[in-house]
From Swiss-Prot:
Organism, as annotated: Lysinibacillus sphaericus (strain C3-41)
Annotated keywords: Ribonucleoprotein, Ribosomal protein, RNA-binding, rRNA-binding, tRNA-binding
InterPro entries documented for this protein: Ribosomal_uL5, Ribosomal_uL5_bac-type, Ribosomal_uL5_C, Ribosomal_uL5_CS, Ribosomal_uL5_dom_sf, Ribosomal_uL5_N
Subunit structure: Part of the 50S ribosomal subunit; part of the 5S rRNA/L5/L18/L25 subcomplex. Contacts the 5S rRNA and the P site tRNA. Forms a bridge to the 30S subunit in the 70S ribosome.
MF annotations from Gene Ontology: rRNA binding; structural constituent of ribosome; tRNA binding
Protein name in the entry: Large ribosomal subunit protein uL5
Listed PANTHER family: 60S RIBOSOMAL PROTEIN L11-RELATED
Function of the molecule: This is one of the proteins that bind and probably mediate the attachment of the 5S RNA into the large ribosomal subunit, where it forms part of the central protuberance. In the 70S ribosome it contacts protein S13 of the 30S subunit (bridge B1b), connecting the 2 subunits; this bridge is implicated in subunit movement. Contacts the P site tRNA; the 5S rRNA and some of its associated proteins might help stabilize positioning of ribosome-bound tRNAs.
Gene Ontology annotations of biological process type: translation
Length: 179
């Protein structure tokens, strides 16, 4: 069992039960899944860019990403419907906890001038969205092999009913929010 999962069961659950006064363990908010999306705009001209992005996501998450395709044609971007323009991974279960642990304890502190993640990035339904400007914050990525610095969106989906509950859950996990 991963470190964060154990922490959730032994420390976070009792703390949340007492703070929000839940009657049942089933009411507890928990992390459902983590979706990591990488948009590769230059895949339109250069198809190798997408392969590099897919490989990087595979290295970071330990799971093969799905290639996302354009839903609509946009002439201004020279984009046709069905063209591959990105990659995404949905992590659940053990891999999800491993990734979250790695993100909180190793990757986020490696961001330059890091002062904590925004408190305002909750969506009102208890999900948290985080933008990462470069893939180099992950220790698995080799700096010399990177052709282009790419960012990604990381969405942490929780079963919490409100932003307050989700914020408390992530704070208990050790997510470094801004003061």
């Amino acid at each position: 069992m991963s470190r964060l999962k154990e922490k959730y069961l032994n420390e976070v659950s009792p703390a949340l039960m007492s703070k929000f006064g839940y009657k049942s363990v089933m009411q507890l908010p928990k992390v459902e899944k983590i979706v990591i999306n990488m948009g590769v705009g230059d895949a339109v001209q250069n198809s190798k860019a997408l392969d590099a992005a897919v490989e990087e996501l595979t290295i970071i998450t330990g799971q093969k990403p799905v290639v996302t395709k354009a839903k609509k044609s946009i002439a201004g971007f020279r984009l046709r419907e069905g063209m591959p323009i990105g990659a995404k991974v949905t992590l659940r279960g053990e891999r999800m906890y491993e990734f979250l642990d790695k993100l909180i304890s190793i990757s986020l502190p490696r961001v330059r001038d890091f002062r904590g993640v925004s408190k305002k990035a909750f969506d009102g339904r208890g999900n948290y969205t985080l933008g990462v400007k470069e893939q180099l914050i992950f220790p698995e990525i080799d700096y010399d092999k990177v052709s282009k610095v790419r960012g990604m969106d990381i969405v942490i989906v929780t079963t919490a009913n409100s932003d307050e509950e989700a914020r408390e859950l992530l704070t208990q996990f050790g997510m470094p929010f801004q003061k």
